[in-house]
Amino acid sequence: MPTPENLATDATVAIMLADGFEEVEALAVADVLYRAGVRSDLISVTDARHVTSSHGIRVVADLMLEDVDLSTYTVLFLPGGMPGTLGLKATPAIQVEALRRSDASQPIAAICAAPSILSELGILDGRQATANPAFVKAIAEGGAIVHENPVVVDEFITTSRGAGTALELGLELVRQLLGDQAAEEVSRGVVLAR
């Protein structure tokens, strides 16, 4: 994604894309981060920079997975969507990085179906979390303490429910990286009633 002209922070967010990703979840978060002055990169886990969303929208990723070191990003963000979530789950580098971040208490965010990836890795065991209603059972079976809030934060793990809560997730990431005032300014800018 183009770097905002005035970066507000050195923090960066890796937005992982597999074919079948949910475009609202990925791009709404990217948009909110951009407005706040946070650099985010759309990273393709496929064999091409063109990634097709779950609704047939083609997006050009900024980078290919093999060209980045995910550990250098402040936040690892996993959008949902089907079959995109399955594509992310099947990517060994994402599994390795999510587990590394869990062990190191470094930020991970996931929305919709993607929290199920964290659950299957054991990362949500005993943690507060949320997911798309169709995946609540899966994360509960993985030990998550499930909530229906739009966004749930448990230490360094942030989860959200779906496309309709993507702006709120983006604002929560802005709050974590830049503080309440920055999140409030972006919220007003996108005319999100809070």
Residue ranges and their predicted role:
Residues C112:
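Catalytic, metal-anchored helix/loop core of enzyme active sites in primary metabolism
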Residues V151:
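Conserved catalytic-core motifs of GNAT/GCN5-like acyltransferases
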Residues P133-V136:
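Short, acidic/turn-prone active-site loops that include or flank metal/cofactor-
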Residues A129:
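Anionic-ligand binding patches
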